[in-house]
Amino acid sequence: MRTEYCGQLRLSHVGQQVTLCGWVNRRRDLGSLIFIDMRDREGIVQVFFDPDRADALKLASELRNEFCIQVTGTVRARDEKNINRDMATGEIEVLASSLTIINRADVLPLDSNHVNTEEARLKYRYLDLRRPEMAQRLKTRAKITSLVRRFMDDHGFLDIETPMLTKATPEGARDYLVPSRVHKGKFYALPQSPQLFKQLLMMSGFDRYYQIVKCFRDEDLRADRQPEFTQIDVETSFMTAPQVREVMEALVRHLWLEVKGVDLGDFPVMTFAEAERRYGSDKPDLRNPMELTDVADLLKSVEFAVFAGPANDPKGRVAALRVPGGASLTRKQIDEYGNFVKIYGAKGLAYIKVNERAKGLEGINSPVAKFLNAEIIEAILDRTAAQDGDMIFFGADNKKIVADAMGALRLKVGKDLGLTDESKWAPLWVIDFPMFEDDGEGGLTAMHHPFTSPKDMTAAELKAAPENAVANAYDMVINGYEVGGGSVRIHNGDMQQTVFGILGINEEEQREKFGFLLDALKYGTPPHAGLAFGLDRLTMLLTGTDNIRDVIAFPKTTAAACLMTEAPSFANPTVLAELSIQVVKKAENN
């Protein structure tokens, strides 16, 4: 039906007769001439109809936006004054000799000339995806997956599929369950990840595995999460953590070079402890130059409980954040930041405005200065390298609240004041995470998952002091986004059962949920390690959007619903009966 794509026509096509298929993007009727911007997957080209082709001109008068059409015509060079440098096809146009209206379009529910609500865009997604910027994002996604496959193939990885219908295992989020008709009362679970299957593939001797795979997690959503998402899943045998990182870093550098033309260079490596201390986050955005500075040792003896309490508490922390040029912030802005940190559990936000250091106490403005002597204030200014015109914010509480609140404040202030260099790419590896964290109920939970190996600990040492265990785990972070994470896995049955025990999983439950894994660990399991990238998040970064729904063809809302298909929906009672399922409706409160 066509000879060329609209968006691929160039000066080299001048004089050629072409047949194009696509949609009317815009129409301009000048009476004796009609111009349309004709669009397809590859882009837009200008087509015009003149009086010498009367039949085509007459039919063109009926065209409206989003009509699906076929045009045959001759490619012509535009006059110099009419060249459109903003279009890839801007040096040429097509003089139409014939026009076929393949399908007409009703009045559109989306307006291409205005910003449409996200609800409307998702409801009429098939129209939203016609927009060039949306089409380009999905084309970039396709390019990324193609590049990944070629890279992994070139590095000896085998693309192996794993089951979608599997057994529920605790991986941190709720499972999506699928009832079995054959096995009454039993359910499959859709996989949160192929974690155990890819480990079993290493035990089977496949050495290097990868898969671009759908995963499912029934969890609360936010802008960068979906109930179903896509992973670039990787596992290797007989490779150390640094070796895995080296290959995966090479993959990501390859993607950025091919898609963006950017060489990311070598990724710095930072421990979890250092990231939390300096940036208040385990996924620091290194484009932001501000860092947290510990000042607790300077404040232990002050007569100000807000500072002295955390300063003398082993579980407490007092951290300062120097904001270059921040002394210009108004009282209203400071109050807004004070309310902002309360979201993260902070009780307030103390500060020192540094107007003129040479004047001592007279050169600063601070509601807490009366509690601090000149010597302590000077020591704080020295340690934070404060200069005239700077602002110093303080966080004082338990370590987690200080990290969360001050880390979030650092990001917000950096963006608000233009301190974060949005033009840069700042990748890094974060390693040496705590193996466990407090579950809030007196127990421990795995910080990553229960199959991660501890670093330099025996099973006995781990059992004796689990709170001191460091996980042999690593996350890749780019511009403050965790784009991938992985670890060295446990390949010893005793160690695996020890970890299960620490997590409160008794032997009976271990056999019930993980018996197949524990059995497999008895038969010469190789050391193995792996990683998974979030394809959606990688694509989001590479296409420059801050909404993950922009890089998924048919995404869900934050309520895990598809507005287009109206999924989820009620099931037919007959089908439910076949599955031995009865829906119990909660009584409404009167």
Curated annotation (Swiss-Prot):
Keywords linked to the UniProt accession: Aminoacyl-tRNA synthetase, ATP-binding, Cytoplasm, Ligase, Nucleotide-binding, Protein biosynthesis
Pfam families: GAD, tRNA-synt_2, tRNA_anti-codon
Keyword ATP-binding: yes
GO biological process: aspartyl-tRNA aminoacylation
Molecular functions (GO terms): aspartate-tRNA ligase activity; ATP binding; nucleic acid binding
InterPro entries: Aa-tRNA-synt_II, aa-tRNA-synth_II, aa-tRNA-synth_II/BPL/LPL, Asp-tRNA-ligase_1, Asp-tRNA-ligase_1_N, Asp/Asn-tRNA-synth_IIb, AspRS_core, GAD-like_sf
CDD domains from the UniProt entry: AspRS_core, EcAspRS_like_N
EC numbers: 6.1.1.12
Record SUPFAM superfamilies: Class II aaRS and biotin synthetases, GAD domain-like, Nucleic acid-binding proteins
Compartments (UniProt record): Cytoplasm
Binding site residues for ATP: 217-219, 226, 482, 534-537
Region (Aspartate) residue spans: 195-198
Highest taxon in the source lineage: Bacteria
UniProt keyword Glycoprotein, yes or no: no
Catalyzed reactions per annotation: tRNA(Asp) + L-aspartate + ATP = L-aspartyl-tRNA(Asp) + AMP + diphosphate
GO cellular component terms attached to this protein's record: cytoplasm
Family that this chain belongs to: Belongs to the class-II aminoacyl-tRNA synthetase family. Type 1 subfamily.
Protein role: Catalyzes the attachment of L-aspartate to tRNA(Asp) in a two-step reaction: L-aspartate is first activated by ATP to form Asp-AMP and then transferred to the acceptor end of tRNA(Asp).
NCBIfam families associated with the record: aspS_bact (TIGR00459), PRK00476.1 (NF001750)
Quaternary structure annotation from Swiss-Prot or TrEMBL: Homodimer.
Protein's UniProt name: Aspartate--tRNA ligase
Gene: aspS
